[in-house]
Amino acid sequence: MAPSGLKAVVGEKILSGVIRSVKKDGEWKVLIMDHPSMRILSSCCKMSDILAEGITIVEDINKRREPIPSLEAIYLLSPTEKSVQALIKDFQGTPTFTYKAAHIFFTDTCPEPLFSELGRSRLAKVVKTLKEIHLAFLPYEAQVFSLDAPHSTYNLYCPFRAEERTRQLEVLAQQIATLCATLQEYPAIRYRKGPEDTAQLAHAVLAKLNAFKADTPSLGEGPEKTRSQLLIMDRAADPVSPLLHELTFQAMAYDLLDIEQDTYRYETTGLSEAREKAVLLDEDDDLWVELRHMHIADVSKKVTELLRTFCESKRLTTDKANIKDLSQILKKMPQYQKELNKYSTHLHLADDCMKHFKGSVEKLCSVEQDLAMGSDAEGEKIKDSMKLIVPVLLDAAVPAYDKIRVLLLYILLRNGVSEENLAKLIQHANVQAHSSLIRNLEQLGGTVTNPGGSGTSSRLEPRERMEPTYQLSRWTPVIKDVMEDAVEDRLDRNLWPFVSDPAPTASSQAAVSARFGHWHKNKAGIEARAGPRLIVYVMGGVAMSEMRAAYEVTRATEGKWEVLIGSSHILTPTRFLDDLKALDKKLEDIALP
C-alpha cells in the first residue's frame, strides 16, 4: 500500500528535496545518516525507493565505514554536536577524504557555533550543497506524528528538571513548527487555558512559525487554509484514556502483547516444526489499516470474511471448517503465500488478544468503564465505587500495573481521596513499591490527595453520546469532543484562547475550487491538501484511542477537514505508567528512553 497523508508528504520531501535535488544521470551517490534522520527516513520511505534514485549504499555516520573517495556523499543529519563532528572527521584524512564531495542536509536549523566549525574545517572545500530542510518529526501514520522525544515528559513535569523546562518547550515548539511548515500550514494557534505550559508552548510555536512565514511568505496561503488550526492541550485534560484497557484492535494489541518497535512476533506451526515470525504492523499492510480501529469482537469475523472472499475470487471453495486452517488453503494455493500470510498474521494477532482478554482483562474492563463513565452499563450512577474496586485490588492474580490503572481511575472519579484512604488502598492492593508512581499523577496536573477527601478537577468533562457502543467500550476519549467542536467552530474561545487573532471566517464558506476539490498537485508532484487541517498536539504523550479519534472525525467531515494528532511520543498504558514513575526521580536514578 503506497504511503498516504503525512507519510507521503514527508517521503516526497526527502526524495525530491534531498536526493533528487542533487541527482545526476549516471552518477551514484552514498547516503549517510544519523539515528534521528534514519528514523524519519525509515518511517516513510522504503530502501528500494532510495536505491532507485541512484543511491548505492546507505550508511550510519556513527559507525565505521569503508572510504569511497570516488563517490559523492549525501548527508542527511540532525544538527547536533556529535553528528557534525563525525561529518568533519570524514574530511580530515590524508591523502584522500572518505568521499569525493559532500551534499549536506540538516533536518533542522544548525546552531551558529556548529555552522562556524563547519566553515573552518577542511570539509568547506568540498561542500557542494548545504541546506536546512526543517523536518524534525516522525510521520508515525497517515494522520499521526511523533516528535520522537519521550524524555520530554520528564523534563517538563519532574520538579528536579525545572531549569530544563523552558529549553524543552523551545525545542518542542521548533519541532511542531517544522511539521506545520512541511504541511504548508500557517494555522491559527489555540491552547487549553489553565496549565502554564500549554500557553507557553503555543506562544513559542507562533514565534517559530512567524520566522518560517518570513522566509516563505506563501506559507498557509489558499482559500480554505485560513481555517486551519493548531490546538495545544495537556495530558491532564484527559488522564483517563491512557489508563483504560481499550478493545479496538491496535490499542488492544499494543497494550496486551509484547509489540516492540511496531513488530509483532508469534509462533507458527509449519509442516515440520514451529518457528517464530516477526511482522511489522504499519501502513504498508492494507489489511492492518482496515482492521486497526475495529472493535476486537468484529476483527476475526472481518478477517475470515475477507479471506473467504479472497479464496472465492481465486475459485477455491471454502467452508466454515477449513477457512481458518490456512495451511490447508496454502497447499492448494502456494502461489498466493504472501496474501495468505497476511490473513494468517491478523488471525493470530486477534486470537492472541482474545486469549489475554478471556484471562483477567474482561473483568477489569467492566470495572474500568464504570469508573471512567461514573455510571454502569445501564446508565445508573455509580453509588459505591469502593465496592467496585476492592475485589480487583485484593486479587493476587491481577498484575500490579493493572491494579494501579484501576486505582488511578478510582482516584480520578473521586477527584482525589484523603491521605489516609490512599494509604489503605495502596496497602490493600499490595502496590507499596509503586506508591510514588500513583502520587506522581499530581505532577501532570491530576488531583490525587485532598484533605477533604474529594477536590476539584482540571479534567475536561466528556460529553454524553447517544450512539450505540459495546458495553465494555463506552468511554470516548475527550479529545474527540474537542476535535468535533473545533471543526464545527464550537470551541469555547475563553477555554481555548487564540495566541493570535484567527483569520476572518468569511472564507470558511468559500467554495472550494471545483477543479481541484480539496487536493491539488504541488511542484514536487505529490498531492497537496487545499482544504483546512486541524492539528492537535498533546503534551505528555498521545494514546492510541486518541489517534483513532483523528481518523473518525476526519471521516465524519466527509473529507472537508483532515485531522492530525501527535505528541512527543505514542503512549501505551504501560508507557504512561512508566512515565509517571520517573517524575519524582533524579536524572541519575532513571534510564531515559
Swiss-Prot record:
<dbReference type="InterPro" id="IPR043127">
    <property type="entry name" value="Sec-1-like_dom3a"/>
</dbReference>
<feature type="region of interest" description="Disordered">
    <location>
        <begin position="444"/>
        <end position="466"/>
    </location>
</feature>
<dbReference type="GO" id="GO:0042582">
    <property type="term" value="C:azurophil granule"/>
</dbReference>
<dbReference type="InterPro" id="IPR036045">
    <property type="entry name" value="Sec1-like_sf"/>
</dbReference>
<keyword id="KW-0813">Transport</keyword>
<dbReference type="GO" id="GO:0030141">
    <property type="term" value="C:secretory granule"/>
</dbReference>
<dbReference type="InterPro" id="IPR001619">
    <property type="entry name" value="Sec1-like"/>
</dbReference>
<dbReference type="GO" id="GO:0043304">
    <property type="term" value="P:regulation of mast cell degranulation"/>
</dbReference>
<dbReference type="GO" id="GO:0098793">
    <property type="term" value="C:presynapse"/>
</dbReference>
<dbReference type="GO" id="GO:0044194">
    <property type="term" value="C:cytolytic granule"/>
</dbReference>
<dbReference type="GO" id="GO:0099525">
    <property type="term" value="P:presynaptic dense core vesicle exocytosis"/>
</dbReference>
<comment type="similarity">
    <text>Belongs to the STXBP/unc-18/SEC1 family.</text>
</comment>
<dbReference type="GO" id="GO:0005576">
    <property type="term" value="C:extracellular region"/>
</dbReference>
<dbReference type="GO" id="GO:0042581">
    <property type="term" value="C:specific granule"/>
</dbReference>
<dbReference type="GO" id="GO:0043312">
    <property type="term" value="P:neutrophil degranulation"/>
</dbReference>
<dbReference type="GO" id="GO:0042589">
    <property type="term" value="C:zymogen granule membrane"/>
</dbReference>
<dbReference type="InterPro" id="IPR027482">
    <property type="entry name" value="Sec1-like_dom2"/>
</dbReference>
<keyword id="KW-0225">Disease variant</keyword>
<dbReference type="InterPro" id="IPR043154">
    <property type="entry name" value="Sec-1-like_dom1"/>
</dbReference>
<keyword id="KW-0268">Exocytosis</keyword>
<protein>
    <recommendedName>
        <fullName>Syntaxin-binding protein 2</fullName>
    </recommendedName>
</protein>
<dbReference type="GO" id="GO:0006886">
    <property type="term" value="P:intracellular protein transport"/>
</dbReference>
<dbReference type="Pfam" id="PF00995">
    <property type="entry name" value="Sec1"/>
</dbReference>
<dbReference type="GO" id="GO:0070062">
    <property type="term" value="C:extracellular exosome"/>
</dbReference>
<dbReference type="GO" id="GO:0070820">
    <property type="term" value="C:tertiary granule"/>
</dbReference>
<comment type="subunit">
    <text>Interacts with STX1A, STX2 and STX3. Interacts with STX11.</text>
</comment>
<dbReference type="GO" id="GO:0005829">
    <property type="term" value="C:cytosol"/>
</dbReference>
<dbReference type="GO" id="GO:0071346">
    <property type="term" value="P:cellular response to type II interferon"/>
</dbReference>
<dbReference type="GO" id="GO:0001909">
    <property type="term" value="P:leukocyte mediated cytotoxicity"/>
</dbReference>
<comment type="function">
    <text>Involved in intracellular vesicle trafficking and vesicle fusion with membranes. Contributes to the granule exocytosis machinery through interaction with soluble N-ethylmaleimide-sensitive factor attachment protein receptor (SNARE) proteins that regulate membrane fusion. Regulates cytotoxic granule exocytosis in natural killer (NK) cells.</text>
</comment>
<dbReference type="GO" id="GO:0006904">
    <property type="term" value="P:vesicle docking involved in exocytosis"/>
</dbReference>
<dbReference type="GO" id="GO:0005886">
    <property type="term" value="C:plasma membrane"/>
</dbReference>
<dbReference type="GO" id="GO:0030348">
    <property type="term" value="F:syntaxin-3 binding"/>
</dbReference>
<dbReference type="GO" id="GO:0045335">
    <property type="term" value="C:phagocytic vesicle"/>
</dbReference>
<feature type="compositionally biased region" description="Polar residues">
    <location>
        <begin position="446"/>
        <end position="459"/>
    </location>
</feature>
<dbReference type="GO" id="GO:0017075">
    <property type="term" value="F:syntaxin-1 binding"/>
</dbReference>
<dbReference type="GO" id="GO:0016324">
    <property type="term" value="C:apical plasma membrane"/>
</dbReference>
<keyword id="KW-0653">Protein transport</keyword>
